[in-house]
Amino acid sequence: MNIWQKKSIISWLLFPFSCLFWLISQIRWYLFRKNWLKSYRSPVPVLIIGNISVGGNGKTPLVVWLVEQLQARQINVGVISRGYGGKTTQFPQLVDAQSQAEMVGDEPVLIVQRTGVPLAISPNRKQSIELLLSRFPLDLIISDDGLQHYALQRNIEWVVIDGERRFGNGFLLPAGSLRELPSRLTSVQAVICNGGTANIGEHFMKLDATFAQNLLTGEQRPLSHFTQACVAMAGIGYPPRFFNMLRRLGLQLTQTYSFADHQAFNAVQLATLASHETPLLMTEKDAVKCRHFAQANWWYVPVNATFSAESTTYLMTEILKYLGKSNE
């Protein structure tokens, strides 16, 4: 939301509610810390990838990157997710590559299709962990989101921030976009800066894209081949990031369409966005919800998180050290 980027009359009017939000959050955190509210400790280490603000900071590409890094090092890893946007009421539930995004959520399906990682969804993180451990011998569990879910004890915390938007106007919800104050970053094990400019102590993450894949045929085509005018759509937390990336890569976008994060789509809704001669580009997260009614001119653009060699070594060494393994 644009009103969260700068201080305005509206944000100042909402500021008292932000103070109330902060007070309730602090009381809740204190109750968990004193064990007056019960929390669950997993038998295996838990690494949480979360954020202190709302709205599309890039957690999913980071989860995919981390899973692939751990799998390459022979670490048995599982992922738990809330399953936002899914309609299912059956919890906990394992997600596989054939799961319907409309039922279990778009992000879990994307993560499983990219990595094949064991993944369970439930609003109750304990249920998800117990289901995974009953089926798979795991060394580590990654929680996709859940930084503020203090009912789950954690061993490692990573926070992703948007390097361009940073902390917006600096206010907590609802006057701003923050769930917690920036001072929270001093207590986490790693701060990941997605795009923009990383501050000292932050690990810069870049999202790279090189090709588009046709939803209907599976054909892969380098983005440099899209020399004609294109239309782009995105139903993610911050759609401008996707559109700006395509423009930086040299694509000519005649029209862009922004949808709500986790929004469900149908054929009628999307059929009129682009003519049959014009490519319609979308995110991979949107594609998992559109494949069963895709048209011939629909393409999705996978993105991959990349880090410097130094950041990769540091991040992986810290995890492997915790697991009692070497980073070779």
From Swiss-Prot:
InterPro entries: LpxK, P-loop_NTPase. ATP binds at residues 53-60. GO terms for cellular component: plasma membrane. Its EC number is 2.7.1.130. Keywords: ATP-binding, Kinase, Lipid A biosynthesis, Lipid biosynthesis, Lipid metabolism, Nucleotide-binding, Transferase. Pathway: Glycolipid biosynthesis; lipid IV(A) biosynthesis; lipid IV(A) from (3R)-3-hydroxytetradecanoyl-[acyl-carrier-protein] and UDP-N-acetyl-alpha-D-glucosamine: step 6/6. It comes from the Bacteria. Transmembrane segments: none annotated. Pfam families: LpxK. It is an enzyme of class 2 (transferase). Disulfide bonds: none annotated. Belongs to the LpxK family. Transfers the gamma-phosphate of ATP to the 4'-position of a tetraacyldisaccharide 1-phosphate intermediate (termed DS-1-P) to form tetraacyldisaccharide 1,4'-bis-phosphate (lipid IVA). NCBIfam families: lpxK. This is Tetraacyldisaccharide 4'-kinase. It comes from Haemophilus ducreyi (strain 35000HP / ATCC 700724). The lineage of its organism: Bacteria, Pseudomonadati, Pseudomonadota, Gammaproteobacteria, Pasteurellales.
